[in-house]
């Protein structure tokens, strides 16, 4: 049995989960998420708990079992609490600012880099070297944060670049002169 798949998901107050065939709809105070799952995996809602089960123990069903449960749990947590990723800009002259609904990054290129947040994701800039990506869909929040980080990933010699808050960047020695 999958260690993740066999855990039940507790539905918090204010969140409703409905099943229509293999499509799950999760509604909560932060928003609504709809996802279609593999029809071979069985999802049962009993009271305020969700159980996920698989038909056989073959490799494909074992993999889908844990994945289905994890995605459902992320949907429930997302619409009730939401997700956020914090990014830091480290480097001389590196700064971020919000212009309307766009995030504008000045990170050492000849031009500013602009990002527009997708529906359900919002970007905050509390300081000019800090960016917070918030939303109820974990996948969209993580993808936008990764795309922002990919503009200027941290380099190992000086540590300059965009990194996640608390991310450890492994540093390297520079070349030594003769």
Swiss-Prot record:
Disulfide bonds: none annotated. InterPro entries: Ribosomal_uL6-like (IPR000702), Ribosomal_uL6-like_a/b-dom_sf (IPR036789), Ribosomal_uL6_a/b-dom (IPR020040), Ribosomal_uL6_bac-type (IPR019906), Ribosomal_uL6_CS (IPR002358). GO terms for biological process: cytoplasmic translation. PANTHER family: 60S/50S RIBOSOMAL PROTEIN L6/L9, LARGE RIBOSOMAL SUBUNIT PROTEIN UL6M. Part of the 50S ribosomal subunit. One of its GO terms (cellular component) is cytosolic large ribosomal subunit. One of its GO terms (molecular function) is structural constituent of ribosome. This is Large ribosomal subunit protein uL6. Belongs to the universal ribosomal protein uL6 family. The keyword Translocase does not apply. The gene is rplF. Gene3D superfamilies: Ribosomal protein L6, alpha-beta domain. It comes from Listeria welshimeri serovar 6b (strain ATCC 35897 / DSM 20650 / CCUG 15529 / CIP 8149 / NCTC 11857 / SLCC 5334 / V8). Keywords: Ribonucleoprotein, Ribosomal protein, RNA-binding, rRNA-binding. This protein binds to the 23S rRNA, and is important in its secondary structure. It is located near the subunit interface in the base of the L7/L12 stalk, and near the tRNA binding site of the peptidyltransferase center.
């Amino acid at each position: 049995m999958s260690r993740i798949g066999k855990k039940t998901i507790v539905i918090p107050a204010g969140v409703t989960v409905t099943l229509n065939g293999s499509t799950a709809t999760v509604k909560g105070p932060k928003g609504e998420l709809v996802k279609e799952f593999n029809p071979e995996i069985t999802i049962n809602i009993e009271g305020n708990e969700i159980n996920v089960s698989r038909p056989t123990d073959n490799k494909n069903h074992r993999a889908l079992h844990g994945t289905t449960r994890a995605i459902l749990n992320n949907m429930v947590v997302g619409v009730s609490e939401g997700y956020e990723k914090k990014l830091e800009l480290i480097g001389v002259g590196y700064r971020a600012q919000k212009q309307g609904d766009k995030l504008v990054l000045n990170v050492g290129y000849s031009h500013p880099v602009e990002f527009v947040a997708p529906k359900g994701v919002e970007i905050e800039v509390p300081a000019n070297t800090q960016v917070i990506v918030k939303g109820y869909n974990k996948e969209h929040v993580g993808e936008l944060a990764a795309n922002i980080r990919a503009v200027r990933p941290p380099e190992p010699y000086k540590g300059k670049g965009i990194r996640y808050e608390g991310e450890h960047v492994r540093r390297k020695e520079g070349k030594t002169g003769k």
